Amino acid sequence: MKIVSNWIWILLLLLFTTLFQACSFNKKMTVVSAASLLEEVAKSSYKQSELRVIQKGMPAYLMLMDGMVEAWPKNERLLIAAAQGYASYASAFIEDHDRIYARTLYGKAKDYALRSLARRGFERASERSFDDFEKGLTNLRKKDVPYLFWAAANWGSWIGLNLNSMEAMAQLPRVELMMRRVLELDERFYYGGPHLFMGIWYASRPKIGGGNLKLAQNHFKRAMELGEGKFLMAHVSYAYHYARRAFDKDL
């Protein structure tokens, strides 16, 4: 694993050198290329079966993204790549054994995602009045789905680790509206990710708080259908969040 880690650092160093040399030549092209590269690295990590490789490489990858965002703070593609990276690292490797650190990571992911959404024209998501918030969502279109999805998902994950905060809990209705808008625009996004989110949403809440196991099951099954077996997280979440509540030992 030491060799893998060293190679990652070498590749990142070469990338930084190339990018900043190119910056003086064509800054716009450099940003687009960097964003595309980060997105491809993120996609590749999801297909990597050796989790130790991902775990060793992610801190360097996150440092790279922070540096890129620092250099180009207004690029929404870089912002959303950073948001996705921090959320993935927190979910896969940190949350189960260090919830305090995971809360910090999700917070950073949330901030990056909301900044990317602001660049798409949906600003001050946590500050605007609820009516204005709801109205603003109707102006978003399918091309805005990646930004809206990751903003809602990361915001929801952050709230999930701040359940003792009334201020955080008060933001839940906004997250729900955001993900419902994603469902309206593109239910297939990220292997049926919006349905997976809503499945967890309904399964993890008590009935008095809006929980509904039947709706949860429907969303989980739709997510698995849209994922076509490529997104194992849907199956894992179905068993973990739904089966435990429904006492279905066959799942």
In which residue ranges do the predicted regions lie?
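Sec-dependent N-terminal signal peptides of Gram-positive bacterial secreted proteins and lipoproteins
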Residues: L14-L15
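Bacterial N-terminal signal peptides that target proteins for export
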Residues: M1-I10
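N-terminal alpha-helical interaction modules that lie
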Residues: S24-G192, L226-G227, R244-L251
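C-terminal motif of bacterial Sec signal peptides marking the signal peptidase cleavage site
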Residues: L19-A22
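Alpha-solenoid helical repeat scaffolds
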Residues: I80, G193-L196, L232-S237
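Hydrophobic face of amphipathic alpha-helices that form TPR/SEL1-like repeat modules
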Residues: W155-W158, F197-S204, H241-Y242
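Glycine/small-residue-rich hydrophobic helix-like segments
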Residues: G210-L251
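Alpha-helical adaptor scaffolds
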Residues: E187-L215, K221
